[in-house]
Every structure is written in structure tokens, then in C-alpha cells.
Curated annotation (Swiss-Prot):
Name of protein: Acetylcholine receptor subunit alpha-1-B
Compartments, record wording: Postsynaptic cell membrane; Cell membrane
Topological domain ranges for the Cytoplasmic compartment: 317-428
Parts of the chain that traverse the membrane: 231-255, 263-281, 297-316, 429-447
Taxonomic lineage: Eukaryota, Metazoa, Chordata, Craniata, Vertebrata
Organism of derivation: Xenopus laevis (African clawed frog)
GO cellular component annotations of the record: acetylcholine-gated channel complex; neuron projection; plasma membrane; postsynaptic membrane; synapse
Gene Ontology biological process terms from the UniProt entry: acetylcholine receptor signaling pathway; membrane depolarization; monoatomic ion transmembrane transport; neuromuscular synaptic transmission; response to nicotine; synaptic transmission, cholinergic
Length: 457
């Protein structure tokens, strides 16, 4: 019994399907018997075809800054009414909707005006939804490459204003009218990008008179998108490494000159920065329209490192000066030994002028310059036998020479220590200056734009 009932139900469903298919086949045959897809679907020639256009943005695929091309995945919804494709559902088994290839019916010749790859037309490989009232809904998916003027002045903290302009290619406003479905594109199914954020989006309808046809307007719908770049990737991979290179450059002046590694560290930083710039150059838009912020900062970092190398050479040269090659000018001693250490609180630094005076030598305590000539018997009543000895006198002269030589060496060492002290003061000054310039330079390049972006939000 159950088996018989199941067979009857199956036969009933199969028969309904056959009859339904038969109704749809008959309907399509009747609709397209005398249908001409080239002719506009209007009652009279003066009537206008009204097309409602809606854009649904699915994905922002790519923004090519170099070629100024934006690739997007969209669905372009188009609705219009075809007076030649109406029917009475009661005559066709209650069929109210059918799906037919878009190439079999008349469709508006909408194109993307600012197309960048030469493929202006919309693909017709999808089907349309046709209702018994003659209303047609066509939502073909498409990947468009549109031209967008990319302004890289504030890269990577930049915003781009891009647009997509859709309009008919041959029908003027007297034959075909296009209206936007709403004042904004549909982003309900938009897949967020890891590099860009959709900050604002709108659409406008324009009536344009072209020079070829000045008497009749052509309509277009333009969708505007404001794209804001997400700068985290560039902050982590470009800006922070450049900032660390700058700080490392400043630390060159914290390294003692006697270590002999100042130039080694400076050259190593320069080589590392050069290799780093070669690696990240592909991340920066290669355009000559403007110098991006990140390009300015990289140039600042390069100049910063080169300046540190030049100044390091001067500091090392100052450190190794001696009285035999350079005489310290009074103003240098006044500024770098007496004035600046007090201003910069170098109270714990041992200065050459504060060193203990060496104890007097035998030659300084004993004036032997009068030991010359002959001593008469009337001068003294007693004369030491040692003074009569020429060897003793020669020894005293030798001691005097040694004392003068030691004094000259002490003065030379003191002058060398003064030059080293000047070099050390320069190192401390330059350390503070370079660290300050590093911070101020970074803020000067990026702070203004970041504040402006926060104010806009």
C-alpha cells in the first residue's frame, strides 16, 4: 500500500514538472516569436526607456599607484521595463518569472567611461530575471579596472578620491534615462581590505553636453569613493626601521673616540641603511608627480647618517691633534673648556685646567744658573771640593736639561689633553643635538599629517 502511494506521489510531481516546463517553453516561444532585441522597448519612438542603476561593491582588489589603476569587483544592478515582454500568468500555468540569457533581450549599452584596460562593455554572460509585467532585473558581476588619479604627497598617510563613471554610449537623454537606485553604492557585502578603508562613498547623476552633440545631453551616474590607506604595514616595516637607524646614528657620538670604532659604526649604519632602502624601494610609489612623506623621511635619514659621518671625522681629527700640528685658539679654550662644560653640567668631568700641578723638580727648586766662571779666594773662605770637579758641574747641567725636557713634555701632554677634552665636549653636544634633531625631524615630517587626519575624523 505504501509503495503504491509513493509511486502515485512521484508520478504527480513528475507530471507537474513536465507541465510546468511545457508552460515555460510555450511562454518563451510566444514572447520571442516576433521580438527584436535591437529595438528600444517603448510604445512610441518618443517614449524614454527609464533604467535604474545600482552598484554593489564586493571587493577592492588592488590600487596600483604607479599606473593609477583601481581594480574592483562589483555587481551592477540594472532594472528597466520591456513593453514587448509582458504576459498573463493565468494563460501559462501561473508562471510569473522566467530567467533568460541577457543576450536575447534589449539591454542598455552602459559602459565604464574611465576604464583603464580597454574593456568598456559589461559582460553579457549572465541571465536576466524577467517578470510578467515586463520588468527586467539584470545584475551582472564584473571586475573593472578604472583610472584614478593617485596623489602620493602624504603617502603612507594618504587618502585617495576615486570614481567610477557609468553612462550610455549611444543613447542620449531623450531616448534613455538612467537614475541611481539610491544616493550611495551598496556596501552590504563589501569585503574589507587589509590596506584600504572605505571612508566615504556617494553617487551623483550628471547631464553632460558633449562637443559632438551639443543639442542633446547624455546622462551618466558617477560613484565616488574616498579611500584611506591603513598605514600600519608601512609604519612597522619602513618608518620604525628608519627611526632606529637615526637613533643608532646618534649613538656614534656616545662611543669613546679612543675605542677606534666610531667610523666603523658610522659606515656600518650607512651600509645597512643603503641595503634597507634597496629592499623597500618597491613598496614606495615610483611617481614623479610629488615626493611622498615616506620618501622625504628616508631622504632625511640618509642625510642624517651622512652628516654624522662627516662630523665624526671632524671629532676624530680634533681628538688626535697635538701642539706640534695645531695650536689651540683662545676662543676654543674659552668656549669648549671653560664655558660649555659649566652650561651642560659637566661638573664631574675632569678638565685639564683642574688637574693638580706637578711638583717642582730639582732644577726648579735649585737655581744653578749662577754656577759658571771662577770663584775667587776672596769670595768664600771655604769651597767644596765637589764644585771644583768638572764632572759634578756637567751632572748639574744634565739635570737641568732633563727637567726642562720633562716640563716641555708635560706642557705638550697638557695641550693634547685639552684637544681630547674639546673632542669629548663635542661628542656630548652632538649626541644631544642629533637625538633632538632625530625626534624633531620625525615629528616635522609626519606629525602635521597625522594631526590633520585626526581632525578630519
Amino acid at each position: 500500500m505504501d509503495y503504491t502511494a509513493s509511486c502515485l506521489i512521484f508520478l504527480f510531481i513528475a507530471a507537474g514538472t513536465v507541465f510546468g516546463t511545457d508552460h515555460e517553453t510555450r511562454l518563451i516561444g510566444d514572447l520571442f516569436a516576433n521580438y527584436n532585441k535591437v529595438v528600444r522597448p517603448v510604445e512610441t519612438y518618443k517614449d524614454q526607456v527609464v533604467v535604474t542603476v545600482g552598484l554593489q561593491l564586493i571587493q577592492l582588489i588592488n590600487v596600483d599607484e604607479v599606473n593609477q589603476i583601481v581594480s574592483t569587483n562589483i555587481r551592477l544592478k540594472q532594472q528597466w521595463r520591456d513593453v514587448n515582454l509582458k504576459w498573463d500568468p493565468a494563460k501559462y500555468g501561473g508562471v510569473k518569472k522566467i530567467r533568460i540569457p541577457s543576450s536575447d533581450v534589449w539591454s542598455p549599452d552602459l559602459v565604464l567611461y574611465n576604464n583603464a584596460d580597454g574593456d568598456f562593455a559589461i559582460s553579457k554572460d549572465t541571465k536576466i530575471l524577467l517578470e510578467y509585467t515586463g520588468k527586467i532585473t539584470w545584475t551582472p558581476p564584473a571586475i573593472f579596472k578604472s583610472y584614478c588619479e593617485i596623489i602620493v604627497t602624504y603617502f603612507p598617510f594618504d587618502q585617495q578620491n576615486c570614481s567610477m563613471k557609468f553612462g550610455t554610449w549611444t543613447y542620449d537623454g531623450s531616448l534613455l534615462v538612467i537614475n541611481p537606485e539610491r544616493d550611495r553604492p551598496d556596501l552590504s557585502n563589501f569585503m574589507a581590505s587589509g590596506e584600504w578603508m572605505m571612508k566615504d562613498y556617494r553617487c551623483w547623476k550628471h547631464w553632460v553636453y558633449y562637443t559632438c552633440c551639443p543639442d542633446k545631453p547624455y546622462l551618466d551616474i558617477t560613484y565616488h569613493f574616498v579611500l584611506q590607506r591603513l598605514p600600519l604595514y608601512f609604519i612597522v616595516n619602513v618608518i620604525i626601521p628608519c627611526l632606529l637607524f637615526s637613533f643608532l646614528t646618534g649613538l656614534v657620538f656616545y662611543l669613546p673616540t679612543d675605542s677606534g670604532e666610531k667610523m666603523t659604526l658610522s659606515i656600518s649604519v650607512l651600509l645597512s641603511l643603503t641595503v634597507f632602502l634597496l629592499v623597500i624601494v618597491e613598496l614606495i610609489p615610483s611617481t614623479s608627480s610629488a615626493v611622498p612623506l615616506i620618501g622625504k623621511y628616508m631622504l632625511f635619514t640618509m642625510v642624517f647618517v651622512i652628516a654624522s659621518i662627516i662630523i665624526t671625522v671632524i671629532v676624530i681629527n680634533t681628538h688626535h691633534r697635538s701642539p706640534s700640528t695645531h695650536t689651540m685658539p683662545p676662543w676654543v679654550r674659552k668656549i669648549f673648556i671653560e664655558t660649555i662644560p659649566n652650561i651642560m653640567f659637566f661638573s664631574t668631568m675632569k678638565r685639564p685646567s683642574q688637574e693638580k700641578q706637578p711638583q717642582k723638580t730639582f732644577a726648579e727648586e735649585m737655581d744653578i744658573s749662577h754656577i759658571s766662571g771662577k770663584l775667587g779666594p776672596a769670595a768664600v773662605t771655604y769651597q767644596s771640593p765637589a764644585l771644583k770637579n768638572p764632572d759634578v758641574k756637567s751632572a748639574i747641567e744634565g739635570i737641568k736639561y732633563i727637567a726642562e725636557t720633562m716640563k716641555s713634555d708635560q706642557e705638550s701632554n697638557k695641550a693634547s689633553e685639552e684637544w681630547k677634552f674639546v673632542a669629548m665636549v663635542l661628542d656630548h653636544i652632538l649626541l644631544a643635538v642629533f637625538m633632538t634633531v632625530c625626534v624633531i625631524g620625525t615629528l616635522a615630517v609626519f606629525a602635521g599629517r597625522i594631526i590633520e587626519m585626526n581632525m578630519q575624523e
